[in-house]
Amino acid sequence: MIEPLLFGIVLGLIPVTLTGLFVAAYLQYRRGNQFGL
């Protein structure tokens, strides 16, 4: 059995991690376009 608190933390971190990766990829993509690469 997984503790509810630990389960809640994992469920909370997953969307934050996915959002962080998406934002980082978007910023890197946009920055590359600004330099014409």
Curated annotation (Swiss-Prot):
It is found in: Plastid, Chloroplast thylakoid membrane. It comes from the Eukaryota. GO terms for cellular component: chloroplast thylakoid membrane; cytochrome b6f complex. It is a single-pass membrane protein. Keywords: Chloroplast, Electron transport, Membrane, Photosynthesis, Plastid, Thylakoid, Transmembrane, Transmembrane helix, Transport. One of its GO terms (molecular function) is electron transporter, transferring electrons within cytochrome b6/f complex of photosystem II activity. Component of the cytochrome b6-f complex, which mediates electron transfer between photosystem II (PSII) and photosystem I (PSI), cyclic electron flow around PSI, and state transitions. PetG is required for either the stability or assembly of the cytochrome b6-f complex. Belongs to the PetG family. This is Cytochrome b6-f complex subunit 5. It comes from Guillardia theta (Cryptophyte).
